UniProtKB/Swiss-Prot annotation:
GO MF entry, a single one: tubulin N-acetyltransferase activity
Name of the protein: Alpha-tubulin N-acetyltransferase
Site positions per UniProt: Crucial for catalytic activity: Q52
Keywords annotated in UniProt: Acyltransferase, Transferase
Function comment: Specifically acetylates 'Lys-40' in alpha-tubulin on the lumenal side of microtubules. Promotes microtubule destabilization and accelerates microtubule dynamics; this activity may be independent of acetylation activity. Acetylates alpha-tubulin with a slow enzymatic rate, due to a catalytic site that is not optimized for acetyl transfer. Enters the microtubule through each end and diffuses quickly throughout the lumen of microtubules.
Gene Ontology CC terms: microtubule
Annotated organism of origin: Giardia intestinalis (strain ATCC 50803 / WB clone C6)
Amino acid sequence: MQFGCNVAEAFGLRRSGVVLLTDQSLRSMPLSQQKKVEIILDGMGRGSQAAQGLPSPITSLAFIRDSHHFLFLAVDEDQCLGILKGGIKHLFMLDSQNETHEMDAMCCLDFYTHETVQRRGIGTRLFRAMELHTHISAQGWAFDRPSPKLLAFLSKVYDMHDFKAQPNNFLMLDASIRLWGAEFKQYRRSKKHYIPDAYLLPETRESEYLGEAELTKRTLIRKSTAVIPQTKTTQSEDAPARALTADELLSKRSVVLPTASRTPSLPDQPQSVAAAYMNKRIEGAGPSFEQYMRDHYGAKSLIVPSEIQTSLNHSKDSVSQEDMIQRQRQLDRMAFTLAREANARGSIHNTVGRGVICGRRG
């Protein structure tokens, strides 16, 4: 689709490639550049509306700027070839057993390639760019009102089919519904989001699919991005990848899900102090909570509530780490109490369980 201006130049490209737009990148643009981008996004939004038969456009500059959604665009000099909009949505989904699962899932909210450039790998390149940005395979996404063309694309490229109709018009694989539902139950306890390992993609540089690229070259179609468990029997490299069952996916572990407002990073995190204490055998009454905090955090990073500073003779200088807020201290006190009781009963190793919060595992 042409707009009477150099589309690539409006997004900072020399000729062609894939660009990523977020609310932050739009707000940082000069006003003159925002006007050009607004014309392009409004035009592509109307094209998507007409192609999908929607009553109104669902993609525009205002929608991206005023939300935490993000948008990928494939551009070639003075043309915009396609768009892919994504973001996290709070959903209620039904699995194959008609059980309801609450979740915060990664969603494909709008997908459109211009009619003149379809079947040239543009859609595959856009999907791959979003996968690298979110580190989540498309097999773990939910799709908002997918068109017949999108369903055919998912079946061909990702071997995704047999979706169950949902009241909210989002479609998702049954295994994904169960996995994200289990993740949200754990989120209610730990307040940490997780990506199921079955849909986690490894850390990869995005430069292959973002920025300058030759879009006339056909992108290699990948049949599956799901993680296949290693078996003892060796398989031929040419053999087709077997799709995981729901039970196999549910048996896999999880890693921390980063926020959607920035590019994900999954650094290793140390074991929590509460879990470390629970793994220790305590003889007798054991140390006090204040001594326990000093042993694990150190005197300089120990936060001392104002009501006990005088009685314990702590100086104001000992409060130096801002992120150790009072709420975390209260949670540590609760964990300390439970761990001491468990140690007193002699069953420390049975109490560690799911309470350990860690980074990338596996």
